[in-house]
Amino acid sequence: MKTGQTVMTRGIADKVADNEKFAKQVTYFMGLYFSGDWGSVSEDDKEMNDINVQMGIGSLMGAYETCEGRIWIMTEHDRSVTTILFPSEY
């Protein structure tokens, strides 16, 4: 699955730098995301992600619960970049 460059927001980067447990969780959830495990998104969103992966088009989104709260991992529709962020940063 093409996901482009992976980046994180300042909020995620700051927490990763300060919290080793959170950093490990982010790394773990990135692995899940890149293997097609979308975390705690709705069944409809999971199905849409799976279709978009098969077709090679459309955006992708995963949601995961961490020790610092929920994070989102989102891939742009053109698959140029994948961003890790807190929902409040959207």
For the regions a language model picked out, list residue spans one by one:
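Short, compact, well-ordered microdomains
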Residues: 54-90
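Compact soluble domain cores
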Residues: 1-61
